[in-house]
C-alpha cells in the first residue's frame, strides 16, 4: 500500500472489465520505463457518490512532481497519452452503471487527486484528446494550488467542470451541485 501512495503513479479502481491482461502489461511497461507505476485495484460493494464511474487516481508524489514542474518531459507525455488511452477505453466500452428505477447509463471516467486539503475530481463524460488532457492537468495544478492556499482548507472538494464553451472551471462542491441542479 505504501508503494502505491508514495511512488510516481496512477491507481485505476475497478478497471478489470476494461483492459485485457496484455493491455495492462503494456501500460505497466510504459510507466516503468519512466520510473512511474500503475496499480490496479478492485473495490466491491455498494458505492454512494454523486460522481460515479471508474476512478483514475493520480497519487500524491506524482501530483507533487506535476505541481513542482519536476516530471520529466517523456514521463509527462507517457502520463498524458496513458490518460487519453484509459479514458477513451472506458468511454468506448459497453460498461453501464445500473441503478434502481433508472435506465442503465454509460460509465464515466473520473480523474481524482486526494490530498490533505480534500479532493480534486473531474468526471469525464466523453472521449478526450491529448490537448484536453493537458487542460485537465493544468486545471488540477491550479486547483491544487488553490486548495493548499485556502485557510482551514481541510476536507474540501474541488470539481473540475467543463463549461458550455468547452473550457474548464474549478468549482467547490456546493457550487457544482447548485450549477447542475443537484441540490
Model-based region annotation:
Residues 1-59, 83-183:
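Short amphipathic alpha-helical segments that predominantly mediate membrane engagement
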Residues 59, 63-75:
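Short, glycine/alanine-rich hydrophobic alpha-helices that insert into or span membranes
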Residues 70-86:
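Short hydrophobic alpha-helical membrane-entry/anchor segments
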Amino acid at each position: 500500500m505504501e508503494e502505491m501512495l508514495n511512488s510516481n503513479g496512477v491507481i485505476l479502481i475497478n478497471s478489470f472489465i476494461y483492459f485485457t491482461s496484455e493491455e495492462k502489461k503494456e501500460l505497466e511497461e510504459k510507466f516503468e520505463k519512466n520510473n512511474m507505476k500503475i496499480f490496479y485495484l478492485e473495490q466491491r460493494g455498494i458505492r454512494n457518490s454523486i460522481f460515479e464511474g471508474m476512478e483514475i487516481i493520480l497519487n500524491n508524489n506524482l501530483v507533487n512532481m506535476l505541481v513542482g514542474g519536476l516530471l520529466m518531459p517523456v514521463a509527462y507525455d507517457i502520463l498524458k497519452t496513458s490518460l487519453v488511452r484509459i479514458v477513451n477505453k472506458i468511454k468506448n466500452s459497453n460498461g453501464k452503471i445500473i441503478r434502481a428505477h433508472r435506465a442503465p447509463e454509460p460509465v464515466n471516467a473520473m480523474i481524482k487527486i486526494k490530498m490533505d486539503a480534500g479532493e480534486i475530481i473531474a468526471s469525464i463524460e466523453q472521449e478526450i484528446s491529448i490537448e484536453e488532457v493537458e487542460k485537465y492537468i493544468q486545471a488540477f495544478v491550479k486547483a491544487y494550488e488553490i486548495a493548499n492556499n485556502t485557510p482551514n482548507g481541510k476536507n474540501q472538494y474541488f470539481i473540475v467542470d467543463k463549461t458550455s464553451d468547452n473550457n474548464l472551471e474549478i468549482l467547490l462542491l456546493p457550487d457544482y451541485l447548485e450549477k447542475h441542479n443537484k441540490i
